[in-house]
Amino acid sequence: ICMKNKKWISLAAAVVLAVTALPMGVFAAKKDSTEEKLTKVTLNEVAHSIFYAPQYVAIEEGYFAEKGLDLTLVTGFGADKTMTAVISGEADIGFMGAEASVYAYQEGATDPVVNFAQLTQRAGNFLVAREEMPDFKWEDLKGEKVLGGRKGGMPEMVFEYILKKNGMDPQKDLTIDQSIDFGSTAAAFTSDDSAAYTVEFEPSATILEKEGAGYVVASLGEASGYVPYTSYSTKASYMKENSEIIQKFTDALQKGMDYVQSHTPEEIAEVIAPQFKETDLETITAIVKRYYDQDTWKENLIFEKDSFELLQDILEDAGELGERAEYEELVQTEYAKNAVKEK
């Protein structure tokens, strides 16, 4: 597929520091004695992050196996790689920002990648300062240097969206450094004091706080309001040929959503801990609580039209949208609605 290099490279920013230090690899769903009867499904996720807790609950609690699916989870480390895996057929389902499907649509994809379930409804990153600022206001960024995200990626676009909402011009009122690789901003923040702020995903935000090197002063998720940040998608052709698999997959995810809505951050952290072996339980719990408290996860997986239009508004505002896509072309809500009915 022909992709706009800069856009696709910038999309990789969405993974960033939300990625816990795990080797790129494959994670299998729990299997039971009916293993040989399970249908194999490959899911490529943009990042392996506590931000996506309901998905890991569904894996660790065996919900996919209950629905007859043998799920293989592969971390793509970038929406460009995840989208490529879906389009090539290497992955059956992709998990990434829905803007990736809009970009592919703009490029003239003949078999569009359709979003069928929305997991997160807020941005997952935080503004970190060098000192505690209990009375922080977005106007405090005027004249300052901030380590930001890649152009065209959701983290950076949402950040600029917030600045504009607060009457600021991202190009004139402050300096946003977009030159640092997505996995290196936290290290750059601690080694070079030229920037007063950095925009960080977890676990980097919490780690900076634990080290006394930075302090979370604002949540981009709270400041932006509800935004369709990450969703599940597949090729229209795969959806047509494997409707039953998509429904079972969505049903299992909904059970994961139900779990996080009815359990404490401590309980959620214990369940997903095996997915983050290199992060201690205390840190996992703190991160889950931070996301839990800001209402990160939807109660259902339905990707509403208003959310899709808001996403395109943000893309348009950032100068990344050639032409608007029709909601019906890139979103299918049937499976998510059925999953809610089955509860």
Question: Where are the regions a protein language model picked out?
Answer:
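Secondary-structure end/capping motifs
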Residues: 240-322
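Predominant activation on well-ordered alpha-helical scaffold segments within soluble catalytic domains
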Residues: 56, 102, 160, 206, ...
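Short, low-complexity disordered leader/linker segments with a strong preference
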Residues: 1-40, 339-343
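Short, glycine-/small- and polar/acidic-enriched structural segments
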Residues: 31-181, 188, 196-202, 213, ...
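Pocket-lining segment of extracytoplasmic ligand-binding domains
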Residues: 131, 183-276
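Conserved C-terminal helix/tail region of periplasmic/extracytoplasmic solute-binding proteins
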Residues: 309-343
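Short amphipathic alpha-helical segments at helix boundaries and their inter-helical linkers
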Residues: 91-95, 292-305, 335-343
